[in-house]
């Protein structure tokens, strides 16, 4: 049985309160998605950690945005179910849970939009030519413990191992800190632990992904 929940993440160094746009986006998910929405924050995160699979030692040193990147990978592999950025939602998610549950696909999401393609510069020379095979990172539903999520999670842990000592020496101090946007010594680039893992997997397993969910609403959400 597919885990019929949507997980959202609001984690960080100081439990910063959401602004009004974020609160409105979250409220719209609660009302319009027609499934259970779970907001994972610093206070309840521990209750979702699976026995034998603790958060990586380096998690504590990540920027807030990278913590959310890490957690969506962790949750999609170990729990499955839905994920959404905290953005406005005006549709029922149940038909998409049904479609995935009644298929052999690994996941279902929204197709990437060529004009909005979030491909990092290191990916663009080849992956930007194949945007039609990709799903957006903003929202999706995955079955847990598939070959897709296993490769996704394993690659994440590999990068975390590689960067651990640098993270200890230069932990994030800014919510949206990344090596390619702030020159601070923080070692992880903006898309390094999500986009640069997720999109190549979408390309490799495009035939096992359903790309029929509505494209996320990206106006006035921050």
Predicted regions located by residue number:
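Glycosyltransferase-associated regions of secretory-pathway enzymes
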Residues: 1-69, 74, 84-222
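Short acidic donor-binding loop at the edge of a beta-strand
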Residues: 79-82
């Amino acid at each position: 049985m597919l885990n019929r929940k949507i997980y959202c993440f609001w984690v960080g160094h100081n439990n910063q309160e959401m602004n009004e746009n974020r609160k409105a986006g979250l409220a719209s998910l609660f009302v319009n998605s027609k499934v259970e929405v779970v907001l994972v924050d610093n206070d309840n995160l521990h209750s979702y950690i699976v026995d034998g699979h603790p958060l990586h030692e380096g998690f504590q040193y990540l920027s807030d945005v990278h913590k959310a990147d890490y957690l969506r990978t962790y949750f999609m592999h170990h729990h499955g179910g839905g994920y959404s950025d905290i953005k406005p939602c005006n549709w029922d998610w149940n038909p998409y849970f049904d479609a995935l549950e009644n298929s052999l696909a690994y996941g279902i999401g929204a197709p990437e939009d060529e004009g909005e393609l979030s491909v990092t510069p290191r990916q663009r020379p080849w992956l930007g030519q194949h945007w039609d095979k990709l799903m957006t990172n903003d929202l999706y539903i995955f079955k847990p413990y598939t070959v897709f999520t296993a490769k996704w999670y394993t690659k994440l842990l590999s990068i975390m191992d590689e960067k651990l000592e640098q993270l200890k020496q230069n932990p994030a101090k800014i919510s949206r800190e990344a090596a390619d946007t702030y020159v601070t010594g923080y070692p992880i680039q903006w898309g390094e632990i999500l986009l640069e893992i997720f999109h190549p997997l979408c390309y490799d397993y495009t035939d096992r992904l359903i790309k029929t969910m509505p494209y996320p609403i990206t106006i006035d959400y921050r």
